[in-house]
């Protein structure tokens, strides 16, 4: 009898390391308690999406997103569900930039944000930039539903490539809808109420495609050579100040929305210049439509 153990199969030194794609969806819900203080009623982390409370007081809760692993890599499917209850204000930030990397998984990496903001509530979603590394394919999807009197501050910053390298491919989709304020049901001359129509209207539906596979992306009609692109959306009931008017400046555009709301878009050579250009209009955004952010948030 031959009792010698079988030799292990030979492994090529050039073989790609195996990695299981990651599928993770975290959840975060904030509600006011009976005393009017905001409390986190659900906080579900899912590696690598790790929300952590870091501050806030009164009706405000501040949460930072902590990355529990590198990436995302190709094929990773990540997401975050948010609910902000009536009267609460949730501020979401991240501790560092997200770097989308190439990998051996099938399809692009994805990150999906879904949020519902209740009556008289506010969501400030202000993460650090997303860097799309060379060779990466990344897709970002955001769907937000606002109550009729809810407020929103949403920032999105994209950096194409790490330092000294070209960027990868990116697709983004941003959809923000507003629930109509409840009112009396319409009636006909006969006094019978017709079937109710849709009670939700679009505020902003926007898609963006960037990367070497997009024809003319570096031309003057799109990026004009810029490596950083970003936007800030502020929406909610006006505070009685003068309406915001459309304006176009040096690589910055401000567009009022029928919401009311304001969308600011900017291009820049790097992340720092992009943030400065977006923040240059922070006074308009803060003063006209949204509560100031709490100190230390």
Swiss-Prot record:
Signal peptide: none
Subcellular location: Cytoplasm
Example of a GO cellular component annotation carried by this entry: cytoplasm
Top-level taxon of the source organism: Bacteria
Chain segments carrying region Disordered: 1-20, 178-201
Residue ranges, compositional bias (Low complexity): 1-18
MF annotations from Gene Ontology: nickel cation binding
Keyword line: Chaperone, Cytoplasm, Nickel insertion
Parts of the chain that traverse the membrane: none
Role according to the record: Required for maturation of urease via the functional incorporation of the urease nickel metallocenter.
PANTHER family named among the record's database cross-references: UREASE ACCESSORY PROTEIN D
Family: Belongs to the UreD family.
Cross-referenced HAMAP family: UreD
Assembly description: UreD, UreF and UreG form a complex that acts as a GTP-hydrolysis-dependent molecular chaperone, activating the urease apoprotein by helping to assemble the nickel containing metallocenter of UreC. The UreE protein probably delivers the nickel.
Full protein name: Urease accessory protein UreD
Source organism: Parafrankia sp. (strain EAN1pec)
Gene this protein is translated from: ureD
